[in-house]
Amino acid sequence: MEQQQTWRRELPNYKQVAPEIDDLPFQAREAINVLRGNIQLSGANLKVIAITSAVAHEGKSSIAFRLTKSLAGLKKRALYLDCDIRNSVTMSRYGMHDQVQGLTEYLCGTAAMNDIVYRTQDKYMDVILTGAVAPNPSELVSGKLFTLLLDEMRKRYDYIIVDTPPINPV
């Protein structure tokens, strides 16, 4: 864990981007905990989990973020990876568009891998945000750099929760 400290960056003007798990209503807390338990007890060595939905505004980004936070609450190294490059709820909800280098910058070759990983207030949870909006997200995430990123993050984290775009066109 100490080695991680040398490459994790501070998120500028970081605000708490999701309520603490304990601040959620009981039913929401329980749903997140059941999901977390199902992942842990699946029998598979699930390390990278994609969260998606049929259409926008169904709550996938909130679920993905809170699931990451819940796993970190168990002292598991957890990474929230925002891959909704065209329409990131997390970036827009918290007004971070011009404040961070993110996945887009890395995939376009203008930022190093270590420059896009940000720590949160939870020492077990980090985030990679989308960064700039890109006109060609499918091409970016299907390239070699995305594969390299996932391979490296698998070494650093117990869980990687990937917030993906909705399945149906936006």
Tell me what each language-model feature is.
Residues 1-170:
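P-loop NTP-binding module
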